[in-house]
């Protein structure tokens, strides 16, 4: 049986480190990747849309900033309800603090 371990990345107003991290995770064949836009605003929509459309990330959005804890809870609930064979989750920060080597 194949198990699922989603990688959850909450993000508020991401910089270039988030797309870089996602590309590295995809190259390492680590997925699914669930990103929570925690109320970043319209000026960041393009970054999130690209990650969803071009890199296959699952994008969850909060209309306003609710904080990292609420963003994680939102993603955990999504994963519990959508990944049948999930055995756990990995969380990573969008600023590149956690490397692919650390995550893997």
Tell where the protein language model's regions lie, with residue ranges.
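Structured catalytic core of nucleotide-sugar glycosyltransferases
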Residues: 1-104
């Amino acid at each position: 049986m194949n198990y699922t371990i989603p990688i959850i990345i909450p993000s508020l107003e991401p910089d270039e480190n988030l797309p870089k991290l996602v590309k590295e995770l995809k190259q390492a064949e680590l997925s699914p990747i669930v990103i929570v836009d925690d109320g970043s605003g319209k000026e960041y929509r393009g970054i999130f849309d690209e990650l969803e459309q071009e890199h296959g990330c699952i994008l969850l959005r909060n209309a306003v900033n609710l904080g990292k804890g609420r963003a994680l809870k939102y993603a955990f609930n999504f994963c519990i309800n959508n990944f049948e064979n999930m055995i756990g989750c990995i969380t990573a920060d969008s600023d590149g603090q956690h490397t692919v080597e650390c995550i893997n």
